[in-house]
Amino acid sequence: MTPHASPDSTTWFEDNRKNWDDRAAVHQASGYGIPELIDDPEAIPSTLAPDVDRLGDLRGAAVIHLQCHLGTDTVGLSRLGASRVVGVDLSGASIAHAREIAESCAADIEYVEANVYDARSAVEGSFALVYTSLGVLCWLPDIDAWARVVASLLSPGGRFFIRDDHPMFMTVGEDVSNGLRIEQPYFQRDTPLTWEDEDSYVTTPGAPK
């Protein structure tokens, strides 16, 4: 299933894939909570911890994590007792790191390199839980098409869980010295927003940017 967007959307996805390929090594080098996951077989990532009580009992459930990046939260989902855990991400470099992390954590996780819009054709089976969180919505050119993918992955009675920033958060300009100002669009548009940044959202002294 492809998103309903401009013909240039393929180029946008490729730019985003390259961006996340570049970020993958930086994020792994930053720590990203990975050493704690490896050292403690019961550790749950701090990014997943707020969701644990809301997710309920996952023992024996099939779970898919969309836009999983390095898969640290995917490891956490496997530690909550899911019988099958799948992580999907656009970035091949992120998936490669995710597989290494899962192996170091002795976590049985299937990782699939695929555009989230192609997740239904890339992954077999259905899932009791489709999970995604933190910084996922802002990368999607077509929310309706994405929602249809999510629905297609759910087994009867399955649940979809998302935790992300409110869209209003992305409308506020970066310079807040004179208060909050709305500078970016709230609603979906046909063209992407672009930024040129020298670093990522983690601090990694000495790491490549």
Predicted stretch roles:
Residues 144-159:
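A short glycine-rich, Lys/Arg-flanked "PGG" loop and its adjoining helix->strand segment in the class I
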Residues 61-119:
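Class I SAM-dependent methyltransferase SAM/SAH-binding core
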Residues 1-37:
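N-terminal, positively charged/glycine-rich alpha-helical extensions of SAM-dependent methyltransferases
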Residues 132-137, 163:
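Residues lining the SAM
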Residues 121-130:
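A short acidic, Gly/Pro-enriched loop at the edge of an enzyme's catalytic core
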Residues 32-62, 76:
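Conserved alpha-helix/loop element of class I SAM-dependent methyltransferases that forms part
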